[in-house]
């Protein structure tokens, strides 16, 4: 029974998910259905949380839109996600960046992780 569940989970998991973590700026292309048309909607922001649970993995992205903070949680292996692109790597010392909710402006900045040789 356990092997069947593991096999089904492995079959449904996406293979093209890039490596990213908290503090990284990502662009998530989401499939949105409006009436009978389907289009891609981009959501760009900072990953403030990531949950690794195999097929049930999820991550939360936060962005500022018109001066208002917007957060959206995504299931990593959802068929509604067309692609995930990492724009910039952030250097943080926490796994969950919930403290960014209370900050704005310069105090909400995240240092960039420079590529190592």
Curated annotation (Swiss-Prot):
In terms of InterPro entries, this protein maps to: Ribosomal_bL19, Ribosomal_bL19_CS, Ribosomal_bL19_sf, Translation_prot_SH3-like_sf
Under Gene3D superfamilies, the record lists: 2.30.30.790
Disulfide-bonded cysteines = none
An example Gene Ontology biological process: translation
Q: Domain of life here?
A: Bacteria
UniProt keywords (A-Z) are: Ribonucleoprotein, Ribosomal protein
Q: Give a yes or no for keyword Zinc in this entry.
A: no
The reply on keyword Ribonucleoprotein is: yes
Q: Name one GO molecular function term.
A: structural constituent of ribosome
GO CC, sorted alphabetically, is:
cytosolic large ribosomal subunit
PROSITE patterns, per the entry: RIBOSOMAL_L19
**What's this protein's function?**
This protein is located at the 30S-50S ribosomal subunit interface and may play a role in the structure and function of the aminoacyl-tRNA binding site.
| UniProt record similarity statement | Belongs to the bacterial ribosomal protein bL19 family.
Q: What is this protein called?
A: Large ribosomal subunit protein bL19
């Amino acid at each position: 029974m356990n092997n069947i569940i593991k096999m089904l989970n492995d079959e449904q998991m996406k293979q093209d998910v890039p490596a990213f973590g908290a503090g990284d700026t990502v662009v998530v292309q989401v499939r949105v259905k409006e009436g009978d048309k389907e289009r891609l909607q981009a959501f760009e922001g900072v990953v403030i949380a990531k949950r690794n649970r195999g097929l049930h993995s999820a991550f939360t992205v936060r962005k500022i839109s018109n001066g208002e903070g917007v957060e959206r949680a995504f299931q990593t292996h959802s068929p509604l996600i067309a692609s995930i692109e990492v724009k910039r790597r952030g250097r943080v010392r926490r796994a969950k960046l919930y403290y960014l909710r209370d900050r704005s402006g310069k105090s909400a900045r995240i240092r960039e992780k420079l590529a190592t040789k």
